[in-house]
């Protein structure tokens, strides 16, 4: 049985510890103070950037080199013997003691009948990719230098340092020679926009009297009987500073290049029908049997278990088809782990039961513990 897990389709990117300063993790975050560019039909056409948007396809010469030889597993057997009865019982007692409503008596008094070692392999392929997108962006124009002369370099010609491998990260840079000054489309170049709270009137309904002008038989003091008070949002002016241009009336527009580094992970657990829930292995460590890293890895071909070889070939082909046309594959890494799982058969109170000891941490899983008592009470 094969259990596969993939995170390739997730959209969120999380910054790694070595993500460069000035980067931001949320793809929706804007690097400036909230200014947005005017509609695309108001912007000039920049050669090489006629169609902005996601997935700027990298040039063909940016692709990784083809692997020269298949990835080979070490020439040895990968059988882990079952753990000893003493260690299995110690793990079981510790497990029972951690459950407030489990009696530790079965774990201490049980009689072992069989311990079976179950070889379970976890195959993981990581493909570290770089993708680039382009879009118009802007910031309030305060008289800064306008870089609008010269030929703009192509999206993949702009050098951007690569962060630590296999760590998600995102960074935005300004494309050189694409800047231009435009009037603010949000406020029609005025620097101010109508106050939404008072609808440009400068006054709002009195909250004290509800606009009646009176409270009972008395004239309302806060509004002096008018039922209206000065708008607190705009100070009675009726307009507020434009949030797009920050009151400048002009925007410095430019093409923004957004670079996303993403670690796309394919994980498969090759289970031999042991009856063990493999989802429990997500945070469990095993013995590393193979680590292979290259710009593009070749499927494993010599592993003793043919299911692992088949899974490796499927994963490599899938990632190549999924990312080679829209991203730049920077590095790949594949690993094979042997996760120790021992199925323990035991007898207690003349009944047979089963539990599993798994991982190098010797965790325990069982679904039919003999004695469960409800000894907890609410004081």
Each PLM stretch: what is its role?
Residues 1-15:
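PEST-like, low-complexity acidic/proline-rich intrinsically disordered segments
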Residues 156-159:
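Segments that form or flank anion-binding pockets
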Residues 180, 191, 203-205, 216, ...:
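Serine/threonine-rich low-complexity intrinsically disordered regions
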Residues 3-6, 20-25, 31, 39, ...:
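Cys/His-rich zinc-coordinating modules
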Residues 228, 236-239, 246-253:
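WD40 beta-propeller repeat blades
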Residues 150, 166-168, 177-182:
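General marker for long, soluble alpha-helical cores
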Residues 171-172:
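Eukaryotic extended interaction platforms
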Residues 186-234:
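General zinc-binding finger modules coordinated by cysteine/histidine
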